[in-house]
């Protein structure tokens, strides 16, 4: 017993010295795991001899010391192969060569330069999880170590080796565990990466991907139904769209440069009139006709939290594609949908079309295009 106690004291003293030294050399960390391995051997032998204590230290069960000893052997041999590679002379901290780091995703790889990313599930800041994006990853390939770069996209955290992507964190699977829908946002500092649901819609409601084409049964379209031109004549009521900018000079004849759009009588965005009013018409006879403008708008409809997240993303990434965005609002009528609304305004139809061609909406957010007749004072 005295011999085991003496050897154990020497081993633990070496461990304390290594911890205090806090070296960045790989050889020191290999020595650290050798000491842990030797400590497990001594404790295992002491338990076999029937000892429950060595001084003030409790002797663990045989299975505990055996398992920990096997782990120490694994780490020692792994670090020795890393030492003999091209990366053996790089600075390595004790934390980077720890067992915990070895088993942190991606497992059985060494990693450096970790950065925390936040994933908000269901567009809800209160339902967020943090993950570590490793920018440098060391992967063992057959008989040698390979240094690769870590990446991040909407799907998850991954690295590329041999031309193949290996995801070690899949955000879709995480969304199934922590969210109520397959929708999430990845926040990296001030940058936001959208979930696939925000990039490509598969539901029947609209996803902004191009100019909208109307069907005979609905005012919304799917991504596959979007076309590059608007229909000139349909079974719906067709009216002439006004020029979108207020004329600076005398009124001009717009008959030769008229855009035709189809608007459903029941779903007009302009609540004051079911039809679109051209600039040459003004219901207020006491004012100059030139001051009446029909402003192009897009009305978004969906869950209030999703709309708030979307509005924040629009201001952060696409603020040049629209003029203004309203706060989240609702109709007060009791027989209307409980969905929230956000209204976007544009300088002209060209800016609105550029917005529709560029921005992608979450699948549960629909939109309607139209005009809002404003009386400019």
Curated annotation (Swiss-Prot):
Q: How is it modified after translation?
A: Phosphorylated.
From the Swiss-Prot or TrEMBL record, state where the protein is found. Host nucleus
GO cellular component terms, A-Z: host cell nucleus
Question: What GO annotations for molecular function exist for this entry?
Answer: DNA binding; DNA-binding transcription factor activity; nucleotide binding
Q: Which GO terms describe its biological process?
A: DNA replication; DNA-templated transcription; regulation of DNA replication; viral DNA genome replication
Q: Does the keyword Nuclease apply?
A: no
- Domain of life, per lineage: Viruses
Q: Keyword annotations for this protein?
A: Activator, DNA replication, DNA-binding, Early protein, Host nucleus, Phosphoprotein, Repressor, Transcription, Transcription regulation
The reply on keyword Cell membrane is no
Give the region (Disordered) as residue ranges: 241-260
Query: Where primarily located?
Result: host cell
Under Pfam families, the record lists: PPV_E2_C (PF00511), PPV_E2_N (PF00508)
The ranges of region (Transactivation domain) come to 1-200
Please list where the region (DNA-binding domain) is annotated: 294-377
> Which ranges are annotated Polar residues under compositional bias?
251-260
Oligomeric and partner information = Binds DNA as homodimer. Interacts with protein E1; this interaction greatly increases E1 DNA-binding activity. Interacts with protein L1; this interaction enhances E2-dependent replication and transcription activation. Interacts with protein L2; this interaction inhibits E2 transcriptional activity but not DNA replication function E2. Interacts with protein E7; this interaction inhibits E7 oncogenic activity. Interacts with host TAF1; this interaction modulates E2-dependent transcriptional regulation. Interacts with host BRD4; this interaction mediates E2 transcriptional activation function.
Q: Give the family this protein belongs to, as stated in its UniProt record.
A: Belongs to the papillomaviridae E2 protein family.
What's this protein's function?
Answer: Plays a role in the initiation of viral DNA replication. A dimer of E2 interacts with a dimer of E1 in order to improve specificity of E1 DNA binding activity. Once the complex recognizes and binds DNA at specific sites, the E2 dimer is removed from DNA. E2 also regulates viral transcription through binding to the E2RE response element (5'-ACCNNNNNNGGT-3') present in multiple copies in the regulatory regions of the viral genome. Activates or represses transcription depending on E2RE's position with regards to proximal promoter elements including the TATA-box.
* Protein's name in the database: Regulatory protein E2
């Amino acid at each position: 017993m005295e011999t085991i106690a003496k050897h154990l004291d020497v081993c633990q003293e070496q461990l304390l010295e290594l911890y205090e030294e806090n070296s960045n050399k790989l050889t020191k960390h290999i020595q650290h795991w050798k000491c842990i391995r030797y400590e497990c051997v001594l404790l295992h032998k002491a338990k076999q001899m029937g000892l429950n204590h060595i001084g003030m230290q409790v002797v663990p069960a045989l299975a505990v010391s055996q398992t920990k000893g096997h782990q120490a052997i694994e780490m020692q041999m792994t670090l020795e192969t890393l030492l003999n590679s091209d990366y053996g002379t790089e600075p390595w901290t004790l934390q980077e060569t720890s067992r915990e780091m070895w088993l942190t995703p991606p497992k059985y790889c060494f990693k450096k330069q970790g950065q925390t990313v936040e994933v908000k599930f269901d567009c809800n800041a209160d339902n967020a999880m943090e993950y570590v994006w490793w920018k440098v990853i060391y992967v063992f390939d057959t008989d040698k170590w390979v240094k690769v770069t870590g990446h991040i996209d909407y799907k998850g955290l991954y690295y590329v080796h041999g031309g193949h992507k290996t995801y070690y964190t899949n955000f879709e699977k995480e969304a199934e565990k922590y969210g109520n829908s397959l929708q999430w946002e990845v926040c990296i500092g001030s940058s936001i990466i959208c979930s696939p649901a925000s990039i490509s819609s598969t539901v029947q409601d609209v996803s902004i991907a191009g100019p909208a084409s109307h069907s005979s049964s609905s005012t919304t379209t799917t991504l596959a139904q979007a076309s590059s031109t608007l229909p000139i004549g349909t079974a719906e009521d067709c009216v002439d769209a006004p020029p979108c900018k207020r004329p600076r000079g005398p009124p001009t004849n717009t008959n030769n440069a008229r855009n035709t759009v189809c608007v459903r009588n029941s779903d007009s965005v302009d609540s004051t009139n079911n039809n679109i009013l051209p600039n040459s018409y003004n219901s207020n006879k006491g004012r100059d006709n030139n001051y009446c403008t029909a402003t192009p708008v897009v009305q978004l409809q969906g869950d209030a939290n999703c709309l708030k997240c979307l509005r924040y993303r629009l201001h952060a990434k696409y603020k040049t594609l629209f003029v203004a965005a309203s706060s989240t609002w609702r109709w007060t009528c009791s027989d209307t949908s409980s969905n929230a609304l956000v209204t976007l305004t544009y300088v002209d139809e060209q800016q609105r079309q550029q917005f529709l061609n560029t921005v992608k909406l979450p699948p549960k957010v629909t939109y309607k295009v139209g005009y809002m007749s404003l009386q400019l004072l």
